[in-house]
Each structure stands twice: as C-alpha cells, then as structure tokens.
Amino acid sequence: MTLGAAGAEEATGTAGPAAPEEVSGSTGTGTTGAGGGGGAMYVADADGGPRPPDWTRRPADAIRAAARPTGAVAVALRHGDLRAVVTYGSTSHHGGIPVTADTRFEIGSLTKTFTALLLAEQVARGEAAYGDPLARFLPPEALPRPRGGPITLLHLATHTSGLPRLPPGLLGSAAADWFSNPYAHFSTADLLRALARTRPRARPGERVRYSNFGVGLLGHLLTRAASGGRQGYGDLLAARVLGPLGLSRTSCGPDLPQATGYWHGRARPPWLIPGLAGAGAVRSSARDLLGLLDAVLDATPDVPSGAPHGSAPSVPVPVTLRTALVDMVRPRLSLHDGGKRLALIWNIRVRADGDVYHHSGGTRGFSAFAGFSPRHRTALVALTNASPAAGQAFIQGAYNALLSLARPD
C-alpha cells in the first residue's frame, strides 16, 4: 500500500532509512514574486514563455524527464539566495489549467515532516517532552501490549517505536476502496482500538522500522497534548505552523482546489486519511514547501517564509516555532553504516561536503520529494500527479537533482 513513495525513506531491520540509490543523472511566463528568506522568487512555466533561470534548467528538466509525459510537475529550488519555481503541464490529463507555483498536490508521507515540526514546537512550548510515554496521553486500555520499556514520542518520531508499518485492522477496512482511498474509512477510534491490540515488533528504541501507524499515532497524541483532543490535527497544524509561516496553500483536506491525481494512469479521488492524518493528510504547493524549507535553512525568519509578496503579517514568527525549526533537524540517531542518520522524521545522508536532508511521499495519485543542504543553503521540492511506478523514478530524479545543487560553487 502506498503512503509515501517510500523507497526513498523506508527502513527495516537495523539499517534504517535508506537514501535513494545515488545513480548518476542529470519552463512560460516569468514573474517575480516574494520567496522565502527575504529573496525574490522567479516563477516560470516551462511549457512556454521566457526561459527559466539557467541555474534551474538542468535539475528541473531532469526531474520533468523522470515524470509521466502527460503529468503535472512543479519544481521549487533554492541555491543560496536564488529561488525559483518551474512548472510543467496542466492540473489534469484532460484539460485542466496550467500548473503554477501555487497548485496544490497531495504530499503523502511528506506530511510526517510537518508532524515532526509540530512535535518540536510543542516541546518548545512545554506542552510535551520527547521522553513522554504514551501513557501520559492515553488511558491504560488503549496502550499496546508491552515489549520492553514504554514507547515515547521520540520513538514515534524516529521510527523506533517497534510498531508495525500499518495498524491491525486497516487492510480489512480498506478493501472496498483499495485502489482509490484505502485509508478513508479508518477513524481515530479505529486507530486507538488497533493500538490496544498491537504488540510491538521490537523493543522501543531497538530498531528502525518505518511506520505510518507510529507517526499517525504521534499526530493524534499531539492534539491531546495541546487541547485534550478537542482540536483536530489539521486545525492544530494550521494554528501552530502553517499560519505563522504564511503557508496559505497548505492544509489537511481537499478544502481548496488541487491537481487531479493519477494512479496507473487512472484519475483518483482526493485522498482521505482521517485516522492517521499526521502520517499523510497534507496537501501543499511548491511555493509553500519551499517556504517551509527556507524557514528551516534560515533558522530564525523574521517574517513568514511562504507569504506572498505584500501580504506577510507584521507579527514575527513565534519564538517557540523558531526554536522548533532548529530542533527538528538535529540528528537523533546514527545508523550502523555511518552514512545515514535520522533527525525527527527527516533522513540525513552524511556527506563529506555537507549533509543532505530528505524525505519523500506519495498517495494514490501523487508523488512528492523535499530535501535540503544546510551547508550550501540549498533546497529542492518536486511534486507530480502520478504514482506509483513513475513515482519511484521521479523521487530518484529529484534526489539526484538535489545532490547536483548541493555542491560548492
């Protein structure tokens, strides 16, 4: 089941999340708008009009070549103080409108990076601690069967909880909508019932095992930490992260227009994942996701990174969120081969010329990638409306393009 073009980040055993294989591989109307971090952003439609900036053409075209010929593609790039969004195609295979920097795509497991930031923000506020056990937020009857010590929030955010990839009972509820919306009928109540009948596959902290179950649970626990569960994940994320960063095209539901997703070439309905929202519910745009990465790279932004030109509110980003942006990317685990680490959710590829952070995602119809290099102040976002097979090549192409940017000038 797809919740993430996860070849880029899934892990089993003790090896941890693997980067995509490092294989070699290698724009319309241009307008100037506001980008993150205080610099101008160039926006170009690659299917006609002025040429995109030269520095974007090779990575953006390589990503486009890895996508389906009829697909919608949006690529956002940052290199130092240079920013651009390059778009290709239309929002559907049969007409639609041209893709723009603000076209919304489902981002699947990239949602987990937002959940990581929300966790770090709540820790900075003092509402939660990384070492908090599940028992702080859940009644005894909802806890999983014990195996070793208690599962903590940090275990959930580093895929070391021992929980399986998917909750027990999910496959049964997904049968009727397997090819379109497999998570649509799995509720928060189902999540808690599944947790109570789960025995972890390993002792907490012992092994890295990629788990949608675990991060979906984390998203729910954060709502309990903030409001006793009265506020849903989407509303909490909007209040604590999306609003303060000015990410106005990002949300957890199909409340705004979005591109049409295609799975094996067939149009799919909007993705619904009510019970595991923190693992895969977010929709976003290339501009907004680059704004998020700008905020991470710049660490202490004075105004929201993703806000359109002229609309940034005068209220500074809260101190707790600034703290969280730094804390989220601090390495937490060093994996046994020495070449990979884990932050909160983010995978880290250790490189002599500067570490690269990355994550990918996918739904029944979309594939997404985001990554950045703090040393080189480089970031890349790639979004397309196709999955699954094309998504793997697309994710690999995006990862390779990020590596090509994250090099000394």
Regions inferred by a protein language model and the residue ranges of each:
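Intrinsically disordered, low-complexity terminal tails and inter-domain linkers enriched
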Residues: 2-47, 298-317
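Short, gly/Ser/Thr-rich active-site loops of penicillin-recognizing serine hydrolases
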Residues: 42, 331-340, 385-409
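Short, conserved catalytic-motif segment at the N-terminal edge
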Residues: 51-107, 127-129, 354
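Active-site SXXK
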Residues: 63, 81, 106-134, 215-225, ...
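Short, surface-exposed loop or secondary-structure junction motifs
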Residues: 82-85, 145-364
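Short, well-ordered beta-strand elements
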Residues: 84-87, 358-359, 368-386
